[in-house]
């Protein structure tokens, strides 16, 4: 169990806080307390594989698409698969339909010789939505998945209604340098008999193929992406930025991202009240790490749902 916690701490997104120490265990992983148990959540109403851009891409749908509220697309982090999003599905699926999928090489989607890139993964997400006949979706991505969500919003703006960025950056320098040192130290031995390795070997038993996959994901996250400020301003989807105050993402980067998306309200600063739905929203959870944020689905659902629903801001009467 401890080794499994260490592996998940190391690779939940391929991004951790703290460099390698003896035995390949990061300082973060060595000190991390056990995560509280999360509900298993609902069963998918539809699941399977679709031919998407040369992949047999695995997806799950919860609820009925095309009814009432805009569906929510969830995009997991690096090395993670649909199973990692169960707490988020459980939090949101009672109020809206939810779609989640495994990226190239992740979970039940086999890897191919195709190069990995955030742009390509964004195109894969767009192709999946179109294959499911979803005209427009709210999109929430975690870490690597947050970067993919940004590319989806940039490259396929008509498909994205609202955008929620969980512990993600739009530029490489938004991460602390220790993050990249930790990624560089990852190797296949750290994944031995982990859920990540077992899922991969169900569809691709070749050990060398798994090693190649790990290296591809490392390269993807080390190279990261560099979206310009102008591109960030041009995104049409209203945006919510969420990080932890002990995240791998620098807090000043999250604030910059928030401001580029129209965040900040001088009128509200002057009156002390918000009179209309803000252009962007920012959440910085206290005492919360990059991995810790994944355990806050219920807390964040109460903040994300009003954003997705355009709920008017509350202005309590003080006198």
Annotate each predicted stretch with a short phrase.
Residues 90, 245-281, 285-288, 294:
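Conserved loop-alpha-helix segment in the C-terminal half of the alpha/beta-hydrolase fold
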Residues 235, 241-243:
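Short beta-strand/loop motif that positions the catalytic acidic residue
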Residues 55-108:
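Conserved HGGG/HGGXW glycine-rich cap/lid loop of the alpha/beta-hydrolase fold
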Residues 274-319:
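Catalytic active-site module of serine/aspartate enzymes centered on a nucleophile-bearing elbow/loop
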Residues 36-56:
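N-terminal cap/lid segment of alpha/beta-hydrolase-fold proteins
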Residues 100-140:
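Active-site loop/oxyanion-hole signature of alpha/beta-hydrolase fold enzymes
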Residues 147-155, 161-197:
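Flexible "cap/lid" loop of the alpha/beta hydrolase fold
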Residues 215-231:
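Active-site nucleophile elbow and catalytic-triad environment of alpha/beta-hydrolase enzymes
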């Amino acid at each position: 169990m401890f080794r499994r916690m260490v592996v998940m701490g190391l690779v939940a997104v391929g991004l951790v806080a703290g460099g390698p120490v003896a035995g390949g265990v990061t300082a973060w992983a060595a000190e991390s307390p056990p995560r509280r148990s999360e509900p298993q959540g609902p069963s998918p109403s539809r699941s399977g594989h679709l031919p998407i851009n040369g992949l047999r891409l695995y997806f799950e749908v919860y609820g009925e698409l095309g009814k009432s509220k805009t569906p929510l697309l969830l995009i997991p982090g690096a090395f993670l698969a649909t199973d990692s999003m169960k707490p988020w599905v459980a939090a949101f699926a009672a109020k809206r339909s939810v779609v989640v999928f495994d990226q190239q090489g992740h979970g039940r989607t086999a890897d191919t010789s195709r190069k990995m890139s955030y742009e390509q993964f964004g195109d894969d997400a767009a192709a999946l939505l179109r294959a499911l006949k979803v005209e427009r979706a709210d999109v929430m991505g975690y870490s690597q998945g947050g970067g993919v969500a940004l590319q989806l919003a940039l490259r396929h703006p008509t498909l994205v209604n609202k955008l929620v960025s969980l512990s993600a950056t739009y530029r490489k320098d938004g991460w602390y340098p220790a993050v990249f040192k930790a990624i560089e130290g990852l190797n296949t031995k750290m994944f031995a008999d982990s859920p990540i390795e077992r899922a991969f070997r169900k569809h691709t038993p070749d050990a060398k193929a798994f090693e190649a996959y790990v290296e591809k994901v490392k390269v993807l996250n080390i190279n990261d992406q560099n979206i310009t400020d102008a591109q960030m301003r041009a995104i049409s989807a209203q945006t919510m930025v969420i990080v932890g105050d002990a995240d791998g993402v620098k807090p000043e980067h999250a604030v910059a991202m928030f401001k580029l998306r129209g965040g900040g309200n001088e009128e509200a600063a002057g009156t002390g009240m918000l009179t209309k739905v803000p252009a962007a929203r920012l959440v910085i959870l206290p005492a919360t790490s990059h991995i810790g944020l994944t355990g806050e689905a219920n807390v964040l659902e109460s903040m994300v749902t009003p954003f997705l629903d355009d709920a008017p801001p509350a202005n309590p009467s003080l006198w």
